[in-house]
Amino acid sequence: MFLEKLNSATSRIKSIEEKLQDINLIKNQKKYSKIIKEYTYLEKINTKKIEYENILNQINDNKTILEKEEQQEMKELIKQELIDLDKKKENLEHEIKILLLPQDENDSKNIIIEIRAGTGGEEAALFANNLYSMYIKYSEKKKWKTEIINFNETELGGFKEIIFEIKGKDVFKKLKYESGVHRVQRIPITESNGRLQTSAATVAVLPNIEETEIDINEKDLRIDVYRSSGAGGQHVNTTDSAVRITHLPTGIVVQCQNERSQHKNKDQAMKILRARLYEFEDSKKQEQRSNNRKQQVGSGDRSERIRTYNFPQNRITDHRANITLYKLEEFMQGELDQLLDPLTIELQEQTLKSNNI
């Protein structure tokens, strides 16, 4: 199965090369860019395939030499070389298998993250703020740029909701598995009896979609303007600068009040709407592809409980890959890679099995 998929992928290179010679293709930049991207991807696989075939040839040659070799010392050297080559072969096979996985066209995109307080009242809102701070610190370590789009703050400094953008290399690829329910266990600052409480916040990671990537009919939108308000419902603007956009066919509602001008708030709201509509359409496609099979692992389902943060034990557990670390304090300071890297590997392994690669 592995070799079949490998040969099938590399066999497409020739037909793509022929397409690229078509002069008319360059006139359609969107189509041209898509084909170039596929060609680059297949060339990468082909390079690995050549490397893999070379290793197989070396293994076969060494086995032939070993059968004929009479000197014990040389035999031991050849055996050691075969062990090394087998290890290289195994590592290369894994690299190729990962490349053969269905490609996520959004991996190179910037993202919009939406964090919402779930069960737990004020404590859930404070935890939502903690998660926001964690992602900001992680972004700083990665040299990514961040910008708040909209937020709804509580009186104690928590967030009922915060929406922000992260721009940088491989942002979606790195953070796409963060979507889901994040559960926290700790003693809240609002708890006078010192009892442990369980609260939750929901995270949604959406690829930032350009205007050209999705068609939105103006007739399908209802746009309302109102005065923006701060924590506790206090008015912070005397003009109708806040914007609420309703997409009538889907019922998706987006509102933005963070910017001072109505025009900027509308632009930001449209940015969120594009991302949510894209996610809405994509989830429908995934549902069709799964043929009614439950595919929760790494699906980014917002209702999926993915992680527990236990502060008294300094413990963080990711339930999808059964990974537990006793480094919660470091994790909340933006040291996410110590969990994200093994998580990605485990989810890739699970995907390989489900795709029979």
From Swiss-Prot:
Residues where N5-methylglutamine is found: 234
Chief location bin: cytoplasm
UniProt keyword terms in alphabetical order: Cytoplasm, Methylation, Protein biosynthesis
InterPro entries linked to this entry: PCRF, Pep_chain_release_fac_I, Pep_chain_release_fac_I_sf, Prokaryotic/Mito_RF, RF-1
Changes after translation: Methylated by PrmC. Methylation increases the termination efficiency of RF1.
GO cellular component, one term: cytoplasm
Subcellular location field: Cytoplasm
Statement: the UniProt record of this protein carries the keyword Cytoplasm: yes
Stretches for region Disordered: 282-313
GO molecular function terms listed in the Swiss-Prot or TrEMBL record: translation release factor activity, codon specific
Role played: Peptide chain release factor 1 directs the termination of translation in response to the peptide chain termination codons UAG and UAA.
Record-stated family: Belongs to the prokaryotic/mitochondrial release factor family.
NCBIfam families named among the record's database cross-references: prfA (TIGR00019), PRK00591.1 (NF001859)
Protein name: Peptide chain release factor 1
Organism this protein belongs to: Borreliella afzelii (strain PKo) (Borrelia afzelii)
Gene: prfA
